[in-house]
Amino acid sequence: KPVLVDFWAQWCPYCRRIAPAFDKVGEQYADTLIAGKINYDEEPQLIQRFGIDTIPTLMLFKDGKALGSVVAPGSKAAIEAFIRETLAQ
């Protein structure tokens, strides 16, 4: 299954604002992908490895490879569009 990752931090107000939309997408797409979160402050090696410099950043992975990313998606619809467009490539 593809994996959708939300790189976020507790001190980031926008991260907290999109969290409910991310969680809903994770539930809605549970049959087709795995959704998870990586805390910016707790995983500096992963942040550096994937070149995350702005949060929230969502990344979509498949078979261990990053397929794409989006910074600060504005809504549940934007997250869904990112998933559809990225998986269609």
What label would you give each PLM region?
Residues 9, 40, 63:
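Active-site loop/turn elements of alpha/beta-hydrolase fold enzymes
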Residues 54, 59-89:
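Non-catalytic, surface beta->alpha helical segment in thiol-disulfide oxidoreductase systems
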Residues 3, 44, 50-59:
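Structural micro-motif
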Residues 7-21:
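Conserved redox-active cysteine motifs that mediate thiol-disulfide chemistry
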Residues 44-45, 77:
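Acidic phosphotransfer microenvironment of two-component signaling modules
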Residues 1, 8-11, 54:
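Short pre-active-site segment immediately N-terminal to redox-active cysteine/selenocysteine motifs
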Residues 1-2, 17-38:
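Conserved helix-turn-beta segment immediately C-terminal to the redox Cys motif
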Residues 7, 37-38, 70:
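Structural motif
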